[in-house]
């Protein structure tokens, strides 16, 4: 017998997951077109004002802004009909040196979808998918996602927390950077 309450709860979870999945593409579009940065730099804007500032089509922008506001990624003031990127969201979407800058994470998620045709056969064979065989956008996405954390923490916090590692690196060491995002961490350490 089906428990209706559990079924509705699970369907709600699935709808939430689907909403999150839709956000992947829309965040990537906003990032690629500079919409978050334009809204952050410009401040509160109507659809028409932001469309002009960003050089995008007003109709598509309205749909994008509506989704972003419904997802609480941006704020909307119905009295002024203006959209705003609050400071907390700006740290996540517009300020590249922020320790919580996350557009790269959304590209990582897109890579997971792109990798499905490679991963699916691995379920049968058990052979796995080599790092170098991943979707090409994954490597840039990993670099972009991890760079803020490396920039804000690697030298200042993470390396000093490892006993003796800083001294070894200062003497000169060979480092293998595998799967860490185009050598971003190695460049920061240098």
Located regions from the model:
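Intrinsically disordered, low-complexity terminal regions of plant proteins
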Residues: 7-10
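A short acidic, leucine-rich amphipathic alpha-helix
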Residues: 47-52
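Conserved beta-strand/loop positions that form the S-adenosyl-L-methionine
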Residues: 178
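Conserved SAM-binding loop of SAM-dependent methyltransferases across substrates and taxa
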Residues: 182-190
């Amino acid at each position: 017998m089906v428990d209706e309450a559990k079924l509705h709860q699970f369907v709600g979870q699935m709808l939430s997951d689907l909403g999150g999945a839709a956000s992947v593409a829309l965040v990537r579009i906003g990032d690629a077109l500079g919409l978050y940065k334009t809204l952050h730099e410009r401040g509160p804007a109507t659809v028409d004002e932001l469309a002009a500032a960003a050089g995008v089509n007003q109709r598509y922008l309205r749909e994008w802004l509506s989704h972003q506001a419904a997802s609480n990624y941006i704020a909307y003031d119905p009295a002024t009909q203006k959209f705003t990127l609050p400071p907390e969201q700006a740290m996540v979407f517009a300020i590249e040196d922020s320790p919580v800058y996350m557009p790269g994470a959304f590209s990582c998620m897109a890579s997971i979808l792109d990798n499905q045709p490679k991963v699916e056969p691995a379920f049968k064979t058990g052979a796995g998918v080599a790092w170098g065989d991943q979707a090409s956008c994954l490597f840039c996405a990993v670099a972009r996602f991890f760079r803020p954390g490396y920039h804000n923490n690697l030298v200042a916090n993470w390396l000093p927390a490892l006993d003796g590692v800083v001294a070894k690196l200062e003497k000169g060491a060979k480092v293998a950077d595998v799967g860490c995002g185009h050598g971003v961490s190695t460049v920061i350490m240098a």
